[in-house]
Amino acid sequence: MSEGGSDVSSLSCSLSLDSDSCEDEFYETNLNKLIENTSLNWIFVGGKGGVGKTTTSCSIAIQLAKKRESVLLLSTDPAHNTSDAFNQKFTNKPTLINSFDNLYCMEIDTTFSEDTAFKINQSNFLNSIIPELLQSFPGIDEALCFAELMQSIKNMKYSVIVFDTAPTGHTLRLLAFPDLLKKALGYLINLKEKLKGTLNMLQSLTNNEMEFEGMYDKINHLNTMSISIQENFQNPLKTTFVCVCIPEFLSVYETERLIQELTKKNISCYNIVVNQVVFPLICPDANIEKCENLLKQIKDTNIQDSFNTLILKAKELEDVYISRRKLQSKYLTQIKNLYGNYFHIVCMPQLKTEIRGLDKISNFSEMLLQSKDIPIYSPQ
């Protein structure tokens, strides 16, 4: 795994086009082990926008519903594409997905809400001391909201929860929240000890002893909560992250950033789904050269013209197909070289239609369980 997440050269790998990949991969190229791991409680699905995170998270949830007692698919992406994927309206309350009796979905907003339990009346100077101190930590408002959200999720009685997350940048901010809370709340707890004498004097002058203690009870509660969430995040038996990408530069680059950040935070990640992959066409007896030889045997000029037009169009399509495969092979090779020793890399084919509706998502979910070689292009 490369070291410098911000360095473009960290993703530079030699491109080998020696053979169309038929060799054994280092890890199984499917998600069977993920689905069969019954100890997992939280599965996060993340990556760059537009790479198929929602389709992948929905598919994982469908497969888990076959193995687990109860499954919740939870969308934290502000776009909330889960409703569109299933052609069913979901809200911020768990709703059974049509045709299931154990698979639920809900869509929530992870942005800061004024309803957070730490809300304190700002009109009173004494009560505003703690919020003002908290605001000196950028992002603490969202972090507090996130902590309460994760605590309520932790208390939900589902066998496993699949998180359909927002694009990478937003997800990285969410992952940073437990550390931010630990730092901010730890600072306030230490501050109380250092200023104990001053606070006692203020309490005696203002008769606000109960309010001070109430504030610090909340701080201690939030601190305990954030530690619990962080422990859950860092327990590989309970939590894992599935990275989703496509074989293009920006997507592979963001995947590397995400994996490096997960590694720094000790969050388990051992599955990568690569969507929109162009696989080899299986048609050994059909090629342009044979068509051109056949054209020479045709005597009728009208048929010749029509057939020649078809050959020219086929050449154009073949050029596009080969160019696409060569480009994808460059990034598939990078993915394989970077992660082949550590990850289950699942390549999913470019499909002809959008994946919307239960039937299409179910078909896609079955493909996630089928092993496929990473299709590195080679000229014949």
UniProtKB/Swiss-Prot annotation:
Which Pfam families would you find in this protein's record?
A: ArsA_ATPase
Its EC number is 3.6.-.-
- Active-site residues, record numbering mapped to chain: 77
Q: Name one GO molecular function term.
A: ATP binding
Origin superkingdom:
Eukaryota
Query: Which amino acids does the record list as binding ATP?
Result: 48-55, 248, 275
User: Do you know which Gene3D superfamilies this protein is assigned to?
Assistant: P-loop containing nucleotide triphosphate hydrolases (3.40.50.300)
- Which processes are annotated in GO (biological process)? tail-anchored membrane protein insertion into ER membrane
**Compartment(s):** Cytoplasm; Endoplasmic reticulum
Between which residues do disulfide bridges form?
none
Arranged from A to Z, the UniProt key words for this protein are: ATP-binding, Cytoplasm, Endoplasmic reticulum, Hydrolase, Nucleotide-binding, Transport
* CC terms in the record's Gene Ontology section: GET complex
Q: Which InterPro entries match?
A: Anion-transp_ATPase-like_dom, ATPase_ArsA/GET3, ATPase_ArsA/GET3_euk, P-loop_NTPase
Principal subcellular localization: cytoplasm
Biological function: ATPase required for the post-translational delivery of tail-anchored (TA) proteins to the endoplasmic reticulum. Recognizes and selectively binds the transmembrane domain of TA proteins in the cytosol. This complex then targets to the endoplasmic reticulum by membrane-bound receptors, where the tail-anchored protein is released for insertion. This process is regulated by ATP binding and hydrolysis. ATP binding drives the homodimer towards the closed dimer state, facilitating recognition of newly synthesized TA membrane proteins. ATP hydrolysis is required for insertion.
* Family membership noted in the UniProt record: Belongs to the arsA ATPase family.
Q: How does it assemble?
A: Homodimer.
* Name of the molecule in the record: ATPase ASNA1 homolog
Q: What is the organism lineage in this UniProt record? A: Eukaryota, Sar, Alveolata, Apicomplexa, Aconoidasida
